[in-house]
Amino acid sequence: MLGDYRSGKTAIFNEIVGRKFGSYTNPSTFDYFYKEIMVDNELVGCNIWDTAGHEKFTTNLNKSFYRDVNCCVLCFDLHFEDSFKNLNKWMNEFHSKCLENGLENMELLPPFVLIGTKSDIPRTDISISNERIEQWCKNIEGQGIIDKVHYFETSAKLSQNIIMPFNTITKLALNYSNSIQKIK
């Protein structure tokens, strides 16, 4: 999971692994959890990593964080402009680190899912509009790196729309892993 500091990554991470909102503290190191998710009547094991605030110290996470990744979750706070503006930075870092880890070209890059967090907070004039989010997705799709940006809005506080993005993430990761295995 990638995104700016305080963009809601840890709250989503904790919800998906069964820790309820507000009942946990932020870890001081990277957080990792293994979760089994049902996809097409098949139980799929997922390794989920959270940067746990390390991105506030550097936007250049160690390339080992990206090793053997099959999908990326990009998160931004629906109410914080900088976290939305920095999505390109996070996506570029993800792509460059994957290439550094041995992927041969851009066509082999793992897919990603975009999550807008804190959807429980009412939208205001300073919030990121749906139109801007749709435009960002179209721009990414237009670059030819990815066919479709899967976008979800979630609220960890209310446990809303947490499962659906991870079902999509798991399906994308499984498809990607299978296609990479065929190439190797």
Curated annotation (Swiss-Prot):
UniProt keyword list: GTP-binding, Nucleotide-binding
GO cellular component terms given for this protein: late endosome; lysosome; phagocytic vesicle
Binding site for GTP: 3-10, 50-54, 117-120
Presence of keyword GTP-binding: yes
Taxonomic superkingdom: Eukaryota
Leader peptide range in chain numbering: none
InterPro entries registered for this protein in UniProt: P-loop_NTPase, Small_GTP-bd, Small_GTPase
Family of this protein: Belongs to the small GTPase superfamily. Rab family.
NCBIfam families per the UniProt record, alphabetical: small_GTP
Protein name, as recorded: Ras-related protein RabN2
